[in-house]
Structures are given as C-alpha cells and as structure tokens.
C-alpha cells in the first residue's frame, strides 16, 4: 500500500481510508500496510504506526459488509538497526491489532554474515515480542535485499511462529523449491513479482502481494482465484500482467499516485519521499495511461468468468 500525502507533505489519512475502500472494492483479500511501498524508511515511527492503525480501522468498518470475507491487514514498519528500537516498533505495530506483524529480512544479521547469525538474531527478536503475535517475513529490497537461504526457510517452517513469507526472489523455480520446503508447515508464500505470478500460482503459491495491485488489482484477484478453472485465459492474463510489471520501477510510487488521481478518483499529491516527483515525466505518465487502456480491455474479457 502506498502512502498518500497532502500538499504540505504530511500524511493524508483521509486518502488512506479511501485507498482501503478502493482495495476492498477491487476484491483484494488483504492489505500490506507500512511496507516499502508505504515509504516506511522515510516515515516517522508515529506515522508508521498510525498508518497501519488507520488501515486496520477502515478494514474493520468495511467488514460489516457480509457480502465477502474480511480483508486481512498486515504491517511492518520494521526499519531500525538497533535491537531495542526494533522491538519497540514491532510491539507498537502489534498493538494496532493488525493480523500479522511483518519482519523485514535485512534487519536480522544486518552485516549479512551467515544464515546461522540471521536465525539467531530473528529468534532473539521473536522471543522479545508477545508470544501471541502472528508474524510474517518480507525480503524487502531496501536498504538491501536479504534473500532467504534454504536453511533460513527450513527454520521458518519449523519455528511455529511464522504465518507467511513475502517472497521477492523473482525466480519461479526458487519459489517452487521454497513452497516444497514449506509444505505442511502452515507457512504461506506470497509472491511479489508480476512476471512469475502465474507460474508461482501453478507451483502452489498462496497469492500475489506486489506493487502492481496499486494499478490493476482486479486482474490479479481474478487470476489468483480462477487460474485453475480457466487455464487458457489465465495464460493470456498472466502474459499481460508480466509485461505491465516492467513499469514498476520508474518513478514509483509517483506513477501509482498519478494513476489514483487520474483513474480512481482518489485525490492525493504526486509527491513521494522515496522518488523525485520531477522524474514523473509525460513519458512515464503515458506508460500508465497505456497500461490502463490494455488492462481495462482485458478485464472486460474476464469479468463474467467466475
């Protein structure tokens, strides 16, 4: 989930609630708040916590609509180097009532020395959190991407503390191996990569959790729910999503904010703290416009296939 800002560059919590409703209306099964897309490295602790709390509050209000299952809300805000500060920010996040607190993989064994050191650091962190706290882990690309080695995945599967992994390895065969390693553990795997989304689903991933759901979540929702029932159409949808996902890097999240303003009637500043607003050129805006045109056309072909 992105963080919308006011023109004075403070967090726009009204727009945050509008975004939650938009994800709901587009069929999303859950929201990852206070994540990298939320620019957590550039938010104060107060805003990291308030962002997750606001998202959870709005999702709970929407749950009164019994026409569909409640959206899960997970959140991280895990950015500190110091161990005590990590415990503080994660405990405060747990207090918001989110369904799971997400540990960022590069915050354990920060010097990236070994799998054993990572496991020891993560175990120490888990022991400092309330025992009832549901946790996930996320291979966040910033400040550097710490991919989970096999030994780390095996430990996660056996620990009994983890609910899921947000996978950013961007390698379908590696995802397949991880899914096999997690089998029977109850730990789910959500893939963040659009290019491997369909292939990963075929291997048994539990869904897609990535930034392109800020542009065309309906297509991902449809594919995740229907790829087995309509395999031929799923291949076509997956191919379109794969191509669209190549737009995820340039000037994001400004591109997503441009999309929300122009196409989703959610007003917010195009300002971002992690990307230069000036870099959102007409060229990049045209990418978003063309992507919207193509994805709307695809959705018209699948909207009645349920």
Name each model feature, range by range.
Residues 43-46, 113-116, 177-178, 202, ...:
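Short secondary-structure transition/capping segments
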Residues 103-121, 166-183, 205-207, 287-293:
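Repeat-unit-sized solenoid/scaffold elements
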Residues 63-66, 156, 181-182, 263-264:
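Short, conserved catalytic or adaptor-binding loops enriched in Gly and charged residues
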Residues 1-2, 26, 97, 205, ...:
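C-terminal alpha-helical cap/extension of soluble enzyme domains
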């Amino acid at each position: 989930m992105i963080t919308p800002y006011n023109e004075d560059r403070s967090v726009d919590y009204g727009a945050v609630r509008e975004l939650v409703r938009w994800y709901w209306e587009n069929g999303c099964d859950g929201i990852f708040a206070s994540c990298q897309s939320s620019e957590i490295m550039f938010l104060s602790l107060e805003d990291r916590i308030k962002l997750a709390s606001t998202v959870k509050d709005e999702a709970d209000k929407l749950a009164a609509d019994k026409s569909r299952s409640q959206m899960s809300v997970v959140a991280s805000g895990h950015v500190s180097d110091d161990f005590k500060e990590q415990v503080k920010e994660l405990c405060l996040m747990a207090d918001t009532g989110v369904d799971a607190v997400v540990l960022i993989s590069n915050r354990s064994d920060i010097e990236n020395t070994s799998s054993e050191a990572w496991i020891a650091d993560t175990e120490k962190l888990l022991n400092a959190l309330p025992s009832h706290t549901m946790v996930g882990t996320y291979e966040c690309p910033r400040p550097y991407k710490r991919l989970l080695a096999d030994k780390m995945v095996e430990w996660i599967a056996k620990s009994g503390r983890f609910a899921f992994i947000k996978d950013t390895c961007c390698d379908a065969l590696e995802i397949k191996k991880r899914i096999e390693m997690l089998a029977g553990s109850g730990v789910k795997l959500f893939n963040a990569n659009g290019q491997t989304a369909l292939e990963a689903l075929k291997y048994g991933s539990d869904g897609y959790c990535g930034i392109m759901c800020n542009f065309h979540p309906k297509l991902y929702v449809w594919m995740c729910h229907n790829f087995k029932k309509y395999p031929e159409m799923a291949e076509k949808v997956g191919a379109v999503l794969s191509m669209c996902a190549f737009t995820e890097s340039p000037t994001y999240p400004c591109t997503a904010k441009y999309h929300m303003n122009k196409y989703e009637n959610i007003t917010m500043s195009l300002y971002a703290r992690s990307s230069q607003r000036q870099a959102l050129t007409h060229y990049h805006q045209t990418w978003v416009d063309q992507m919207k045109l193509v994805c709307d056309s695809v959705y018209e072909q699948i909207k009645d296939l349920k």
